[in-house]
Amino acid sequence: MNDNPVNLKGLETIYSFSKKNKQSLPPVEKWNPPFCGDIDMKILRNGKWFYMGSEIKRPAMVKLFSSILRLDEDACYYLVTPVEKVRIQVEDAPFVAVSLNKVEISSKTGYLFKTNLNEEILLSKENPLTIKIGENSEPSPYILIRKNLHALLSRSVFYELVDLAEEKIVDDKTCLVIESMGECFNIHEVEKE
């Protein structure tokens, strides 16, 4: 870890960009600045952001940092500006899906998730659901937010989704499946007694 404090020099540029383009995100995938070290910033599994051991409580600041977050091929998370890149720690996923709504779009039923940062994501082919089974055999459900950044579904949202799912045969197995925007997403194989 780099003990020198890192100054995110490009942050003011990002802030002005995000104020002008509320729906757009900075093009962090196009930026290739030098790596400037690690900073003491961490995103907990519950979606709370901490800097130097203190929770960042200003939603606008968390949203700003999340807009410049990138997951690179080395499986590390970085905050990226045009002039520098710093590594942060993420316990699980950087976002948490905290609510779920059923929607009708172009005569198709879909499910709209809202994250802890008020981003809305439609469960679809572009934003699929994935389930990872942990060492404790507990499922961890995720929805793709953008590029390779995911939101962990909160326990209550996952239970709500399971309640909405239907049993279907998938590859000769009975599974709980949720259909959204014409796509089927396998939640879990149903164990028959």
Briefly describe each language-model feature range.
Residues 1-193:
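Long, non-globular segments of proteins
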